[in-house]
Amino acid sequence: MNQEVMNLFNQQAQPQSFDQIKISISSPEKILSWSYGEIKKPETINYRTFKPERDGLFCARIFGPIKDYECLCGKYKRMKYKGVICEKCGVEVTLARVRRDRMGHIELAAPVAHIWFLKSLPSRIGLLLDMALKDLERILYFESYVVIEPGLTPLKERQLLSEEEYLRAQEEYGEDSFTAMIGAEAIRRILQDLNLEKIAADLRQEIATTTSDLKPKKLLKRLKIIEAFQMSGNRPEWMILTVVPVIPPDLRPLVPLDGGRFATSDLNDLYRRVINRNNRLKRLIELRAPDIIIRNEKRMLQEAVDALFDNGRRGRVITGANKRPLKSLADMLKGKQGRFRQNLLGKRVDYSGRSVIVVGPELKLHQCGLPKKMALELFKPFIYARLDAKGFSATVKQAKKLVEKEKPEVWDILDEVIREHPVMLNRAPTLHRLGIQAFEPKLIEGKAIQLHPLVCAAFNADFDGDQMAVHVPLSLEAQLEARVLMMSTNNILHPANGAPIIVPSQDIVLGLYYLSIVADGAPGEYKPNNPQNPMQGVYGDFGELEHALASRAVTLHSRIKWRWKGLGPDGEEISRTYDTTPGRVILSSVLPRHPKVPFDVVNKLMTKKEISAMIDIVYRHCGQKESVIFCDRIMGLGFSHAFKAGISFGKDDMVVPENKWSIVDETRALVKDYEQQYQDGLITQGEKYNKVVDAWAKCSDRLASEMMNRISSVQKDENGADKQVNSIYMMSHSGARGSPAQMKQLAAMRGLMAKPSGEIIESPIISNFKEGLDVLEYFNSTHGARKGLADTALKTANSGYLTRRLVDVAQDAVIREVDCGTENGIRMRAIIDAGQVVATLATRILGRATAEDLVAPDGTIIVPKGQMIEERHLEAISKAGIQEVKIRSVLVCATKNGVCATCYGRDLARGTPVNQGEAVGVIAAQSIGEPGTQLTMRTFHIGGAAQIADSSFIESSFEGTVRIRNRGLARNSDGDLVAIGRNVAVVIVGPDGTERAVHRLQYGARVRVDEGDQIKRGQRIAEWDPYTRPILTEVDGIVAYEDLIDGQSITETTDESTGIAKRVVIDWRGSARTADLRPAIAIHDQTGKVQKLPRGSDARALLPVDAIIGVDPGARVKAGDILARVSTESAKTRDITGGLPRVAELFEARRPKDAAIIAEKSGTISFGRDYKNKRRLTLTPHDGSEPVEYLIPKGKHIHLQDGDVVEIGDFIVDGNPAPHDILAIKGVEELAAYLVNEIQEVYRLQGVSINDKHIEVIVRQMLQKVEITDSGDSEILTGDQIDRTELQEINEQLIAEGKKPVQGVPVLLGITKASLQTRSFISAASFQETTRVLTEAAVNGKVDTLEGLKENVIVGSLIPAGTGAMIADIKSIARRRDDLIMAQKAAESGAALPELPAAE
């Protein structure tokens, strides 16, 4: 008896643990095996009794009882009848919960096609039968017959016949001589009769023998789907339904509202339509109705089932009573509101609350202020338990009463409960992992949450009404994780770049800056050999100094001598004397004592950068605990001194430069001059525009620097002592608030503005905000401001979507092992842009592992292979003058299903080597996505003031000797050296003979140095006109025009505003008559023959469309003179608006609009015959392989001449290179370098720092697939794309069997495509295109092994990262232990337990 009672309670089956999920097409038998009964009536529930109708959609006999352990008619009630089936109403007595998982079915009177397999592209049924979707639809929707068995008639198998043709054929050949059918029965019959083995063999044969290029692709597609059916055990005819499953009624509820109305799920409507039409069809068949009526009913049934599965995919959307489209089964899964994203990936959480945040400056870094009311509500169960344990209450009810009355003992207990129990604070939008952090709650009065000021940067929070949510970690494990991993004190460094993120900002910075200012002539300052008081301003003791400050004998800013006591390198006490100020001494008093933290750290002007560096030093040397205490202390110091200083500013603090109007007048004169040049026809409209904009930009910059000089200089009073520093300058210079750009607008001139289209308006705003704008200026400035606000709204969404795609593609990149042992690596060097070092080598290699020994020139090993490059190595590396380092990278990591710790390097958020199980992919995605949102939200800060970012010269950043590589220079008529070669480079060689910098020269640049010159830092190397691309002559001679026919290929345009003529090449391809002209300028010698260039081809320059010709026929020219010029587009404002789409474009690996054409081999260029309106260019490779042909649209400017030699990877036509071409031509390393640099460029422009390794992680995920070039001895087909790891596994097996391995080339996929092609179909389906992903997965019978993070979140298990990764290891150890115990039991030998094998 006892056992039975126990069984009663244990009957609820435990959820099965599983480690993979398979999806396939269900057969009619399978559907019937799930079903508990057939639904025959469309009725739902009786509107009077509210009881379900029998055999209806809510039938209790089929789906189970409505109340627990009670049958419908009430004959059997209570638990003792469990399992009894009532003979009166047929209901089983059990839990009502079974109505959530018992299914029903509808037997269809006629088969119908499953719309997903029919209409989800590519149509699976269509591919399988090799029929067009249009034809299939005509058969299915009863418009055409299809011949199934032609017999002896001349009809073909699968030929479509219209109604008339069918009748005619029957008359002609007799009714029984052939079989033709219509509707889904026909398709089902064809699918049933398919012989998959034979078709597959035929297709393989055809692929092997076909010669055309396009055919194999089509055949491959079909072969793939046929193989999928063979492998997965699905039968083709299952794509046609004969039975429709009905989902459990509690998943499509029907709830009575008051007033006799019902709220119902749309599915019930859709099911009712199916049942109604099905029943009507059954009746019509029984009544032997005319064929046409039955056919119509079958078509309607097909449409009803289509609407049930995927409403709106075919034909009109079916709407409900309120004209709203009904939500079908497919819609339940799809999109943001679908099952995947709404319920499985994002759930609402209990034990949470939200409130407004206010600042809590007296909190410690690990604390937050929690309102008592909130805490009482959130910790209720803990309080009840503690009240019970202490004997204050015997039952939960009593405890509840106590808490509701807020008795004093409740507050005491709340204090106990909350002690050491961290809570998590989250601020939406959570853009990176620092958007959720754990704090220890501190109970406060009031209703607002208090937040520590230093964590605001991580949350991106401010106190203008932001709200935050509080979550309580309940279990011990959760509390442990919150404390160890998420505590705010454990998140001092930014995961994106490793810099401290707990940095003081705003008031604190201002206070510290004020504290560290030095003022000359302040009272009590130390004067050397001061006869009156030689000891004035000399202090050795902190108390003495405080006393002097309090008695006003000395100010915070006076210069004093101070004896500092600290620790020497071995930890011994030392003392030194410093020239400093009392303010800096106060600041030094909070520094931790450590040999590596000397007084020099604070003995300087404390700007935000310096403070950040100081925190960094303290963190690296003194550890986390010291840094946290230190941060809290400097915060207090900063606040108190900002408060004491009382810094404020007034109108007069904005100093307008005195010479403002003289500079403006100068510029106006210059602009007038350009106007005149334009009137005289010396420059074009576009060039004038560019020059005017340039002039105003320069004027604006000059004014800004004048103003900065005025504001930053400290005035002296009559005694020669410093007056107060300008407040605005203090705020801006310290980094507390405001930027030079904003100060410029306040006090210099507002500057150039952009139109909404992004072009710059020629007339700038000359006034500043202090003087005030006039009406016209104000109007011009509204554009930029409005555009900024509109952009903000749009780009937040874009940036969020980019982050979502990044997370999706990288979610399964997890650290799986310590070292994969690969020998490969990538080479890193400093990035130099226009002669400026943009990213130093040190910043790029810090915290990465070396791929080979890093050896100094004298042979000493600085860093051995496989070791991490730390801060202490950097000095040695720069001393050794090393320019290039080979480091390990995730791009070359050989770990399967993840990456290894050595290839990844340092965990930036902790400053230590990365741990196993760290989800580096998600961190990378957040690090790249988070600033995207930040930046887009901040576009309007510059107020649209145009910033011209176009350099037109190179300056040397080093001293040294000039060497010129690939010398192609000539002296032109003006006596300037001009670069006439395409790859001329100026190399700066240091005194030790190492190359310090290499500058590639723009074609047509005027070179200011020559071979062997000594060059100083900052000296000009070359300059060029940024607005035009010149076409030069390479030899001296006489100009001759070729094919430049007036009105056909050249036109003299007279500028309407100037009356000046200029010759422009026009598009000559318009008419057939002129299509084969080749407009060019040739250089003749004295005899009138075309001269030869040194490499043997003719001296002839082909002209592109819109080239402006600058020489007359017959004119004498010297090498390096300009023959014609092509105007480049006007300078656009570079703003991250261009940036975010650019980042997305690079990650999506889209081909740019005007993609560059890259040379695939090194070789010689020759021009072939023109083809229609394209130029034919042939590259003959040096290695003797087949020549490569390129067809280039005629208007494009090709800067190569006949006979030019190009290197592999050189640009034949300029433009943005397509990433796929870089991968194919130069390989993975070059591609990665290109993507990393291009993406970094966008972020750098905005001053955002992201570590390269994050971008590398994403690029690795984009390169997961391989295209098969040679299938070796395997079953794989050439041209197929498979996973890299799959290829490795297949090859290992083939090599083991001594067969020929498969060859493949890496393929670059955009992030969206890569996410949709992950091995896990659950992850792909929850991302985008759910229908397509699931259809494909079902056809292939895919198995999801649940390896990534997303799949595991969806099925509700622990994610295989972080602590979850360890759980998996522990489980596998436990399993092995179980096996051993079982084996031992079986043996029953009584031997000792064998040694446990180590975890893999």
UniProtKB/Swiss-Prot annotation:
Disulfide bonds: none annotated. Belongs to the RNA polymerase beta' chain family. Its cofactor is Mg(2+); Zn(2+). It catalyses: RNA(n) + a ribonucleoside 5'-triphosphate = RNA(n+1) + diphosphate. HAMAP family: RNApol_bact_RpoC. GO terms for biological process: DNA-templated transcription. DNA-dependent RNA polymerase catalyzes the transcription of DNA into RNA using the four ribonucleoside triphosphates as substrates. InterPro entries: DNA-dir_RpoC_beta_prime (IPR045867), DNA-dir_RpoC_beta_prime_bact (IPR012754), RNA_pol_asu (IPR000722), RNA_pol_N (IPR006592), RNA_pol_Rpb1_1 (IPR007080), RNA_pol_Rpb1_3 (IPR007066), RNA_pol_Rpb1_3_sf (IPR042102), RNA_pol_Rpb1_4 (IPR007083). Mg(2+) binds at residues 462, 464, 466. This is DNA-directed RNA polymerase subunit beta'. Zn(2+) 2 binds at residues 820, 893, 900, 903. Zn(2+) 1 binds at residues 71, 73, 86, 89. Binds 1 Mg(2+) ion per subunit. Binds 2 Zn(2+) ions per subunit. GO terms for molecular function: DNA binding; DNA-directed RNA polymerase activity; magnesium ion binding; zinc ion binding. GO terms for cellular component: DNA-directed RNA polymerase complex. It comes from the Bacteria. Keywords: DNA-directed RNA polymerase, Magnesium, Metal-binding, Nucleotidyltransferase, Transcription, Transferase, Zinc. It is an enzyme of class 2 (transferase). The RNAP catalytic core consists of 2 alpha, 1 beta, 1 beta' and 1 omega subunit. When a sigma factor is associated with the core the holoenzyme is formed, which can initiate transcription. Its EC number is 2.7.7.6.
